[in-house]
C-alpha cells in the first residue's frame, strides 16, 4: 500500500452573497489544498495457499490532508466522505486506519461467507475447475475530488463488487461540499422547496431524449414509451440525492435499478444552470 500526493488548485471564490449562507462564519476557505490518495491493491486467498480462491481488492481513495489541528474544513469533509463511502463506523478514524480496517472487515466477511462451503467441496473431491466462480470475490473503489460550481468541491466514488450472483454490481456516490465550511450540500440546501415537481418534469424530458438516443429508437417520446422499455415501471421520476454541482450545470445520477433495468446501466442527466437557476437557493455572482 502506498500514498501519492497531488496538488489541486482550488480557485479563491469571491462571493457577494455567501453560498447557501454557510460560508459566512469567518473560516478560511479551502485553497490550493493537498489531496492525498491511499492506494491499495491486494489479492487475499481464502486459505493459506496460492491455489485457493481469492478476494481481489483495489482501492484508490482520495482525502484532504489536514495541515494542523485547526483544519476543521478538511476534517469535516473527510469525516463525511468516510461515513458515506465506507460506513459510519469508520467516520472518526484517520483515513489510512479507516481503509485498513475496511479491508480487514471485508476480507473477514468474505472468508466467513464461503470458507466452509469451499472446504466441503474440497473434502468431497471437487476439482479446481469445477469449483463455483463465486468463491472468488472482487471489490474496487475509485474516488476523486474535483472543482465544481464556484464555491463548491465535488467528490465522486465508483464502487465495483462481485460476490456471487448473475452479474457484478457497480454504483456511484456523488457528494458536494461548501469550500468555506466543509458542509455537505444536500438537495434541500441547494434547491428551493417545491422545486421537486418542475425539476422532475425537466429530468423526465431529458430522460426521454437520452433513452431515444441510447436505444436508437426515435419512437420513444413519452413516459409510456419509456415504460414499454422497462424504464420507470416501479417508480415515478424524481430528483435524486446523487447529484453534482458542476461548473456549468447540475448533473443527476441514477444507479442501476434506480429507474431502469440493470442492462440500461448508469444514467446521468444534466440541467444547465440557466434552466434551473430560478429553483436554486442564494445564487452567487459569477
Kindly give the residue locations of the regions a language model identified.
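Compositionally biased intrinsically disordered regions enriched in Thr/Gly
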Residues: 24-286
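Bacterial Sec-dependent N-terminal signal peptides
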Residues: 1-34
